[in-house]
A protein has these predicted regions:
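Oxyanion-binding "anion nests"
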Residues: 1-22
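Glycine-rich, acidic loop segments that terminate in or are immediately followed by a histidine
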Residues: 20-134
Length: 134
């Protein structure tokens, strides 16, 4: 538990310091740090609580060798607007020979590292599509 708590503290400090990278419809944070990878899903949730842009889903992307693990979170407000991260993570990851899925409010994916930028752009477009077609 001590290592996890220390990792969480480090993760919170990291997102407070770095903030999130903003796209039109999503925001994301990225790391290759081993300790931050262990707590990335929780850090995504904390990012929402710490006041990252609340009307944009947040993705935590963690590089692991040739893969990127993605953890995504959103708010009830975004779900009411039509966002379903489980569908987005599933469909977007399959476009890049990855895998993913989950729930409307929290989902994940694993994708090839060399497709990370394309994946982020597709997720951004898919969020816009879901909102505009709700």
């Amino acid at each position: 538990l001590g290592k996890y708590a220390s990792g969480m503290q480090s993760g919170v400090e990291w997102i407070k310091r770095e903030g999130s990278i903003q796209k039109d419809n999503i925001q994301y944070i990225y790391t290759e740090d081993k300790e931050q990878k262990k707590v990335a899903a929780a850090v995504s949730s904390i990012g929402i609580e710490l006041g990252f842009v609340p009307d944009k889903p947040i993705l935590s992307l963690m590089r692991m060798d040739n893969l990127v693990k993605v953890s995504s979170r959103t708010t009830d407000n975004m779900i009411e607007k039509g966002v379903n991260l489980g569908v987005i993570m599933n469909q977007a990851s399959q476009n890049f020979n990855g895998s993913g899925g989950g729930h409307n409010i929290a989902a994940g994916a694993t994708i090839p590292a060399n497709q990370m930028d394309n994946f982020i752009n597709l997720v951004d477009e898919m969020v816009a599509y879901q909102i505009n077609n709700n």
